[in-house]
Amino acid sequence: DFALASLKALVENHYNVVGVVTVADKPSGRGQKLHESPVKLYAESKGIPVLQPIKLKDETFVNALKALQPDLQIVVAFRMLPEVVWRLPKYGTFNLHASLLPNYRGAAPINWAIINGEKETGVTTFFIDEKIDTGAIIAQEVTPIESHETAGTLHDKLMVQGAELVLKTVDS
């Protein structure tokens, strides 16, 4: 899971992660067994509070997030946030995106880079604003796309590179 690598990096490097927001548990598979996200399972194993809102503008969720008093919010592989959420922390909210923005904004940037025959891609951290993947860029790291690369192998490379960039961004 792309987001899990960044969360693990933050925890393993002793950052004070005051909470995690992840997707709500949902039924999947033949038996429609309730599936919990890897981010939720990891956070719970580390004693980190987990919020799983259905609607991000829900007053109960927003109040619970405010109660955590985050100084900074980091978004990885999640949906677009409403302004009431991304404006909350003192130092803002930044996102990790799996492309060299402004290229490949939006969904499936890894797939599109391969489909379009790009020779390189990378990861970007940027401050969230009103539009999708348009905020001020904080940092970028480039990685080559090898001729044998698949979306899966590139995903895994960018996941590791992205977690490292999240740490560099928090430290800057």
Cite the ranges covered by each PLM segment.
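Short beta->alpha connector loops
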Residues: D1-A3, I54-K57, A77-M80
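N-terminal Rossmann-like dinucleotide-binding module
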Residues: D1-G31
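Amphipathic, non-transmembrane alpha-helical secondary structure
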Residues: L4, K8-E12, V62-K66, E83, ...
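Donor/substrate-binding cores of folate-linked one-carbon enzymes
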Residues: N13, L72-S172
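N-terminal glycine-/serine-/threonine-rich beta1-alpha1-beta2 phosphate-ribose binding loop
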Residues: V23-D71
